[in-house]
Amino acid sequence: MRGLEMPESPIRKLAPLAAAAKKRGIKIYHLNIGQPDLPTPKVGLEALKRIDRTILEYSPSQGYLSYREKLTHYYAKYGINVEADDIIITSGGSEAVLFAFMSCLNPGDEIIVPEPAYANYMAFAISAGAKIRTIATTIEEGFSLPKVEKFEELINDRTRAIMICNPNNPTGYLYTRREMNQIRDLVKKYDLYLFSDEVYREYIYTGSPYISACHLEGIEQNVILIDSVSKRYSECGIRIGALITKNKEVRKAVMKFCQARLSPPLIGQIVAEASLDAPEEYYRDVYDEYVERRKCLIDGLNRIPGVYSPIPMGAFYTVAKLPVDDSEKFCRWCLSEFNYEGETVMMAPAAGFYTTPGAGQNQVRIAYVLKKEDLTRALVVLRKALEAYPGRTDSDK
């Protein structure tokens, strides 16, 4: 049974423990999930309120043309030049990943993915009958990519693609121009697909340039871009994403899956299209807030004895190393056995973002999607939890 092979979500699998803690009256600081708490653009919410239809019909399988045309102008601002026909609207970025895998890969084909990686990539590869081959990045090196030779060690006659997330979930790493050119050269040399998840492009904090896979010359037919409005506009619940590619054969294959699932969400597209008119100050305010939260979290983590976090360059996550024997045991313990003044923290055990056995055993992914006051308090609670945890691996309490 294929479902038995599907990995549990490291982000959501502890939800029953959290629910039980809340029943006991414990307040939980949710650092486990990338659900922004910042407001959805008013123009999107107003469009939702204005919906006045007598029938909520199917939308076109490719998505509304008006929305796709408007998206071309959005992408052009980032130097991504596409036409409306290059864009397929999906039910969230997750469906875009799944349809890309199902369209481009045969059972037994392999995808090279830097790890740690977003856990659902593994799940969708299993759904497609494909195999993830991971290439290790390390917290000590800030999760930068290894040299090209390490990639080539993994390439064989079943290798069909490389998958990246840029800026990265779960690490917050931003690929450099050198790294993107390295990936381009591999894609060109071995005629691979490049699946590029770029849903966090708005959130780059270092002044470094955003290098999209669509900027890479010579592999235009190999690139499949994955996008979503979920994190950009705090619209996770409307489930609107996009798959973008210049490759007509890939689009033709993807459309067969789109037609089989009938249509992307009608109401979600209305909200997402309207949200493209959000004023520039909306983006600035959201960006500035994440800059402050990032500093609050990373400074606070690195002040806790035994804890280390690199400085994430983008997105709104970090992977931190904790002085614990097993991060999943620690996260479970925080929810089931610990509280400090009636409060505790919920984090995502990082081992679930790796496929290499034993990797990430003492790491957690933390999302800085809470206001600074809550992040500051969550750091106090985390420090107290580490001081009390019986499986702590150092004596510096």
Q: Where are the model-predicted features located?
A:
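PLP-dependent class I/II
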Residues: 4-8, 14, 21-27, 33-51, ...
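Generic structural signal for well-ordered alpha-helical scaffold segments
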Residues: 19, 72, 76, 101-102
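Basic nucleic-acid-binding alpha-helical/helix-turn surface characteristic of O6-alkylguanine DNA
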Residues: 54
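Conserved N-terminal alpha-helix of the aminotransferase class I/II PLP-enzyme fold
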Residues: 58-91
